[in-house]
Amino acid sequence: PELLLNKEGNTIRTMTLAGTQARRDDSNYIWGKKELEEHTMTGLHIENNITKSKGEILSKNENPYTIESGKVAHLRTDYIFKTPIDFNLTAFIKTLHPTPAVGGLPVANGLQCIAAHEGYDRTYYCGIIGETDFDTTAKLFVNLRCMQIGENKIAIYVGGGITSASIPEDEWQETILKSKTMMEIIQPKIPISILH
C-alpha cells in the first residue's frame, strides 16, 4: 500500500508516489514527460489540500526521487507539514482521498467517469486502510495493488496513471509489471492461469 498520511501529534507526513517505469538493474532511471506530468498533478493535489487545511509545509524534497518496489520504480516526493490548532483529520482525509491516482482530476468528474464505465465494484481496492485514533495519531495507506481471494479464483487489482500523454499499450504493460510482483508471491503455491 501507498502511504496516505502518517500523523503524530500536530505533524503529518505524506507523499506523492506517481510516475512508474520498469525496474532497472543499473538504477539509471530517466523519467519521461508523461511520468513527470503525472507526478506533478498528484503533488499539486496534495499541496493544494495542505494549503486548504491551513497546514504549514515544514519539509518537501526539492525534486522527486526514485524508489524501487518489486518489478517497478516510482517517482516520490515527501512532505512534512504542521497542522493548525483547529485541524480536522477526518475532513482532511476526505479532501486528500481519493487521490488523482485513484480517481483522476478533477476528482468529481473522474469518479463519475469511473462509476459509469469501469464495470465492477472496487470493494477494498483504492480504499483507505490503517490505524487512527482520529486525534493525535494516524497511519493510513491507500490500498493499491491488492488481491481478493475467492473459493476458486484470485483477483489482482492494479492500475496505471493515465494522462493526456499516455500511450495505451505502455499503460497496459505497466499494469502487467505491477501485477507480477503479487503473482510471484502466490504462483509458487497455487497453479494459476492468467485471464486478461
Map each language-model feature to its residues.
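An anion-binding catalytic pocket shared by soluble metabolic enzymes
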Residues: P1-M41, T136-G159
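Contiguous alpha-helical scaffold segments within structured protein domains
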Residues: R13-A116, Q187-I190
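Conserved hydrophobic core element of enzyme catalytic domains
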Residues: E2-L3, D78-H196
